[in-house]
Amino acid sequence: MSINSMIFLTAFLPVVFVLDRLCVRKTALKNILLLLASLVFYAWGDPVYIVLLLVSIAANYGIGLLLGCQRDESVAAKTVLAAGILVNLGILGYYKYFDFFLRIVNRLTGSEHEMRNIPLPIGISFFTFGAISYLMDLYRGHYEAEKNPLNMALYLSFFPKISVGPIARYRDFAPQLTNRQETVEKTAEGIRRFAYGLGKKVLVANIVGASVDKIYAQDITNVTGVMVWCAAILYAIQIYYDFSGFTDMAIGLGKMFGFDICENFNYPYLSGSIQEFWRRWHISLSSWFRDYLYIPLGGNRKGKARTYLNLAIVFFATGLWHGATTAFIAWGALHGFFIIVERIGFKKILDKIGFLRYVYTGLVVLFGWVIFRVANLRPALQYIRRMLTPWQYTQSTYALRELVGNRCIVMTVIGILGMGLIQAGIKKFCPAAEKLKGGVLELVYCMFLIAASMLLLVNGTYSPAIYLNF
């Protein structure tokens, strides 16, 4: 099940919401309801993986209790923590990277081990990282071990965030398990945020993505340089509205049930450097790698060379987290390279060149998205070659307008304006418009977004989140 599917919108969510409201002032009962709902949500598509989720919950609950019994930073505590991390990474590694490493072994040894093609359980990267952050912060003494297994289960399985995040921290989530408010105002804000997210996903990402798919479905020899540029720009819009749309829906759902889920985006395409881009894009992942990999490796405390090495490791891991292919590793390496270059001194130059720094950042991100979308390094480089020398590739049996329809053009314009330009303009030139927030006009707008999105979903334009594959 997905939070943008018709079964979720018309059956699952209304039923769970009504039952939650019937549990008046009974937080423990609400938690049990939400846990059961989350397990049903997770098991809906492929029930077999509910066992994996329950094993992960039980393992991390037990390891947490064991870790909580050790003295701070003792050898025993470090051993338990290391074992816990290995258990989590072992589960993730088997499902996500087994075939990847088997291919490497085959190439190095000349063997012909058969690929297992292991299906990837939904949300495994997200709940695994959530579990590791729980254990590491417990080891650091940020809180006591969770004694209630139901609380641990709800933290890892909470249905708004389990599929595509954000990656919630236990220290932020745990207090809300026993003390949260379900007010009319918070519920209304949640519905508003959910409506915006649903509209971003269904009305913008899906429509723009259809044209992206058409272009990339062509044989590469039949794609002009202009088409590749167009596809790159459209995909940048698609992935932002797809992922941030799901994040908005998750945050909105959380508020509807009294929870505050962390923000994950802050208009990343307004960034003037790659460093800034990663402070605005997938914030919960970048901050996770900062806190649980970069800083433990030494951060920037052990000299420049070590800092650059640590950054390289972090972005290698970032690429690998997204997928077990050389393309995703190359995508991570691309971002890591430019962040290191900026740290070496290029950032000072960027600060002096005004608007050009946004052009630089946009180009790096666009080339990265080509690698990310194609997900295969060799053809991705062929597409990039066409972008760099578009005048050499002008022949195609298709006109661009055959691949990019009117709806896509309209949503592209709306998408570009909605990536921070409209918001910045309203804040600067029309601050009074902020007072309309929560008013009748916004209510009508939200109702329109939900109705239009559901109409498209009914007509068969449902598509899962891009990040559902990670």
Each language-model region and where it sits:
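Membrane-embedded transmembrane alpha-helical bundles that form the catalytic cores
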Residues: 1-419, 424, 429-469
